[in-house]
């Protein structure tokens, strides 16, 4: 099965963007609760 390059990149971005967004929120809330 040949994977479309653009579709492959889109799939990675589709997973990566929300993950990074959640990580940033998690780190910010963690720092706030510490102080």
Curated annotation (Swiss-Prot):
This chain belongs to the protein called Photosystem II reaction center protein M
Q: Keyword Coiled coil on this protein?
A: no
The protein's matches in InterPro entries, at most eight in alphabetical order, are given as: PSII_PsbM, PSII_PsbM_sf
Q: Name one Pfam family in it.
A: PsbM
GO terms (BP aspect): photosynthesis, light reaction
Modification type N-formylmethionine: residues: 1
Keywords annotated in UniProt: Formylation, Membrane, Photosynthesis, Photosystem II, Reaction center, Thylakoid, Transmembrane, Transmembrane helix
Q: Just give the chief location class.
A: membrane
Q: What happens when the gene is disrupted?
A: Decreased photoautotrophic growth. Decreased assembly of PSII monomers and dimers, increased levels of the CP43-less intermediate. A double psbM-psbT mutants only assembles PSII monomers, not PSII dimers. A double psbM-psb27 mutant is incapable of photoautotrophic growth, but does assemble the CP43-less assembly intermediate. Cells are light sensitive and rapidly photoinactivated; recovery requires protein synthesis and can occur in the dark.
């Amino acid at each position: 099965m040949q994977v479309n390059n653009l579709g492959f990149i889109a799939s990675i971005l589709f997973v990566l963007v929300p993950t990074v967004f959640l990580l940033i929120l998690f780190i910010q809330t963690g720092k706030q609760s510490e102080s």
